[in-house]
Amino acid sequence: MTELVGVGLGLRREFMDAFLNAETHPDFIEVAPENWMGFGGRHAKLLARCVEKAPLICHGLSLSIGGPHPLDLEFIQQVKLFLQRYQVQIYSEHLSYTHDGGYLYDLLPIPMTEAAVNYVAERILRVQDILGQRLVIENVSTYLMPNAEMPEAEFVREVLLKADCELLLDVNNVYVNSVNHDSDAYAFIDAMPKDRIRYLHVAGHEQVEKNLLIDTHGAAIRDPVWQLLQYSYQVCGVKPTLLERDFNIPSWAQLQTELSQIKIMQQQGSRNEGKANILSHNATTVL
C-alpha cells in the first residue's frame, strides 16, 4: 500500500489543463467518483492522464451514510469498480445524509444521538464489507444541530470507534461549526482519536453574519483556519492535507502558492515533532 503523504489538491475540470501542463504537481489529487463514474472515452483518458501525474484518492458525495433509506448497493458496487479501476486506496465520505426519497443536493446533519451512532456505524460496517477497505468519514459543516444529545466531537468519535473506520478531519469545517454553534474548535481537535485520522481537508469559507459562516470552498484559507491547521499538526502530528477549491477558482499560480503555504507549515510541524521526540528521549535517558 502506498502511504499518503504531503499536500494534495481537489481536482476540478476548470484547472485540469493547467494541472496537466504544470512542471510540478501536488503530492496527491482527489475527485468525487460520482463525477467520473460511467464515463469512457475522452473523460476516462483525461482522468488517467491526471493519475499518471499524482496518486488519486476519492471523496464521495452521495453515499448518504446517515440517510433514512436503505443503502444503495448498486451504487456502492459502482464505486468499488471505480476504486479498483484507478487503484484508489482511500475513499472518504461525509458524515451526513443526502437522500430522503430523492437526492437533496446538500449535506444534511445527522441527529447526534446514541441511536444515530449505532445506525450509522452499522451502515459504515456494511459499506466497508462490500468495498473490502476501510471507509474514511468526514466531519461536516452544519448550521443546525437537530435533536442533539451529545457534542459533535463525541458523536464523531463514537462513530469512528464503533464502526472501526477512519477520519477525514476537515479543519475548515471544525472552525465553521465552532462559530456557528459557539463551540471550541481546539477542544474538538483534542477530542479526535489521533490514530484514526487518515488525512485533512482545508478550504475557505464565507462570513454571512457575525456568528454565521458558510463552508463555500470559494475563497482562500482564512487566518483562523491556518491557525487551527497548525494546532492540528501540533497535537495530531503532521497529516496529509488537501486543499479544496470549488468556486471562484483562482489562477494555477495562486493555487500553487496556497499549496506551498501548507507544505511550509507541514515542514515546520515535522521539525517541531523531531525536537519534541529528542527532548522526550533525553528526558527518559536522564530518568
From Swiss-Prot:
Residue stretches in coiled coil: none
Pfam family, one: MbnB_TglH_ChrH
Gene3D superfamilies hit by this protein: Divalent-metal-dependent TIM barrel enzymes
SUPFAM superfamilies referenced in this protein's UniProt entry, alphabetically: Xylose isomerase-like (SSF51658)
Cited NCBIfam families: PRK05409.1
Family named by the database record: Belongs to the UPF0276 family.
Full protein name: UPF0276 protein ACIAD0933
High-level lineage: Bacteria, Pseudomonadati, Pseudomonadota, Gammaproteobacteria, Moraxellales
